[in-house]
Amino acid sequence: TIILDEFDQLLEDSQIHFVEKITHYAPRDHQLIYMSATTKFDQDKIAANTRTIDLSDQKLDNIQHFYMQVDQRHRVDMLRKLAHVDDFRGLVFFNSLSDLGSAEEKLQYRDILAVSLASDVNVKFRKVILEKFKDNQLTLLLATDLLARGIDIDSLECVVNFDVPRDSEAYTHRAGRTG
């Protein structure tokens, strides 16, 4: 059995040739499981004898969404105030690396335990940062959409979108880190 999670991302990144290469070398009677939380694709073009399990009607009643409009120049200060709430721990998503880096610098200057995690951080250090966050050693984990997919952090109560997500799929994956 071969399981490919975040298959929609492979399709978007035009990586289907890697999937074809993997399946070429797999045993003839292999089972291939494609998983995707947000994108529907024509699976019959990819494989024969397919089955779809649609979970899109499942509601996550334990996730509350609310919107707060904050002027761009006051957003870091808003994060600072959130960080001072007792037992607060949050994952903050940014659309750009420059905004993420700037916010990290400003928060650390104000003695907030905030660390950024983005594509420019090596995998070994990413794991260290995630473990520190999971162990409550960090108050804020600042991230790009790299972290919106495929991570699991128990008891994460708050996701903050520093920037409006670029599309509804990004929003779904960001919000899905809670609940």
Regions found by a protein language model. Name each.
Residues 1-179:
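Conserved helicase RecA-like core
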